[in-house]
Design a protein with these regions (language model features):
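Hydrophobic residues at beta-strand termini and immediately following loops
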Residues: 29-31, 71
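Glycine- and acidic-residue-biased ligand/ion/polar-headgroup-sensing regions
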Residues: 34, 45-56, 73-75
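A short beta-strand-loop-beta hairpin characteristic of the jelly-roll/cupin
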Residues: 55-66
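Cyclic nucleotide-binding regulatory module and flanking cytosolic helices
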Residues: 1-27, 75
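Short phosphate-coordinating micro-motif centered on Lys-Gly-acidic
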Residues: 37-42
Length: 97
């Protein structure tokens, strides 16, 4: 099993078969370094499952970015329009969307 699948199954307590069924319904996307996939101002609802790369989740307070967490292979990001966080790629990334 690929590393991102192992981590995803372990972290979210789901079976590999269930994850593969979900991934079959999703599109594999390639993201460039510096790409914003979610922000407090983006009216989008989406789910990303990270296959490779590093992403930065942050919030902006008083004009300064404050790190919330870093994401990598096997992490999932649920982006929704009421989020106060932004997510930006720090490296080239591959994800399911």
């Amino acid at each position: 099993m690929e590393a991102y699948l192992k981590k995803l199954c372990f972290e979210y307590q789901v079976e590999e078969k269930e994850v593969k069924e979900l991934l079959a319904r999703m599109e594999r996307v390639y993201l460039d370094k510096g790409e914003t996939i979610a922000s407090a101002t983006m009216p989008e609802q989406s789910l990303y499952i990270i296959v490779s790369g590093i992403l930065h989740t942050f919030t902006t307070q008083q004009g300064e970015d404050k790190t919330v967490r870093f994401l990598s292979e096997g992490d999932a990001i649920l982006c929704y329009n009421t989020s106060k966080h932004s997510v930006k790629t720090l490296t080239r990334c591959v994800a399911y969307y």
